[in-house]
């Protein structure tokens, strides 16, 4: 099926690429794609295109990569050029998903039908950069995707639609991301079809209560503080998969922990102490309870099940992981 509604798309990572693919496959014309500039990545630190750029190029869509859209920012000339390109590109609506650049009011006002954002939380909870990570870290029972009509605030726009999903006890940011990306793709296609048919999308202001902010994840957060409760640490491990991982330091070596579950305490060992190193998992004493770690990674190595990790890197009861302020 082909559509006449013309969609400019702005996004950067895989979450956004899923939405762009759905829009394209549904038959909506995409006259322009905005994505962040290529960035150095990987061990070789070679420039790599974003997931959105890769999809757009593969499917013959024009791509622009301005470093900013703010005339008053660090790149005023590039921003002005990008804004003129937006004005010169015939379109009806802009869809924004995990773009990573601020859109000033001048840009929001360009599309006839405004800008629709796909946000990976149930707004107003978890506005901001890392909603999936923070929902898992906080122990939320559910999360979802919200479509909103963008305004200049940080994820403060009126809500068009949402989809809710339960957070499973073994969900990681990686697994939850994929389900939310699929839901976001489905929601935006349905919304664009309604917009094309009806000419407008009803939207409801966000409630004033229940606002929380999902701060960007920093590498410094990876260190596990064994003085915390085991269930808190288990959520941290799941929330930080695939980035930045949960890090435990032993004899100066940073070991990444990728899968763990809380278990009952074993004795009265000090937090961070290994109380058992078995093929089924490495059990570590915590501030409350204990953590059974079932997947580990040594520096320069691969993620391994506990059984394989211990075969190559033996651990023993009585060894103690460093506490963050002592690492």
From Swiss-Prot:
GO molecular function of the protein, one example?
methionyl-tRNA formyltransferase activity
Keywords, A to Z, come to: Protein biosynthesis, Transferase
| Lineage of producing organism | Bacteria, Pseudomonadati, Pseudomonadota, Betaproteobacteria, Burkholderiales
Q: Where does (6S)-5,6,7,8-tetrahydrofolate bind?
A: 121-124
Catalytic activity reported: L-methionyl-tRNA(fMet) + (6R)-10-formyltetrahydrofolate = N-formyl-L-methionyl-tRNA(fMet) + (6S)-5,6,7,8-tetrahydrofolate + H(+)
Q: Which family does it belong to?
A: Belongs to the Fmt family.
Q: Name one Pfam family in it.
A: Formyl_trans_C
Q: What is this protein called?
A: Methionyl-tRNA formyltransferase
**HAMAP family tied to this protein:** Formyl_trans
The main enzyme category here is transferase
Keyword Transferase part of the UniProt annotation: yes
Gene behind this protein:
fmt
Disulfide bond listed as a keyword = no
Give an example GO cellular component term for this record: cytosol
**Where on the tree of life does the source sit, at the highest rank?**
Bacteria
Per the UniProt record, which EC number(s) apply here? Answer: 2.1.2.9
Origin species, per record, is Burkholderia vietnamiensis (strain G4 / LMG 22486) (Burkholderia cepacia (strain R1808))
Role of this protein? Attaches a formyl group to the free amino group of methionyl-tRNA(fMet). The formyl group appears to play a dual role in the initiator identity of N-formylmethionyl-tRNA by promoting its recognition by IF2 and preventing the misappropriation of this tRNA by the elongation apparatus.
Record InterPro entries = Fmt (IPR005794), Formyl_trans_C (IPR005793), Formyl_trans_C_sf (IPR037022), Formyl_transf_N (IPR002376), Formyl_transf_N_sf (IPR036477), Formyl_transferase-like_C_sf (IPR011034), GART_AS (IPR001555), Met-tRNA-FMT_C (IPR044135)
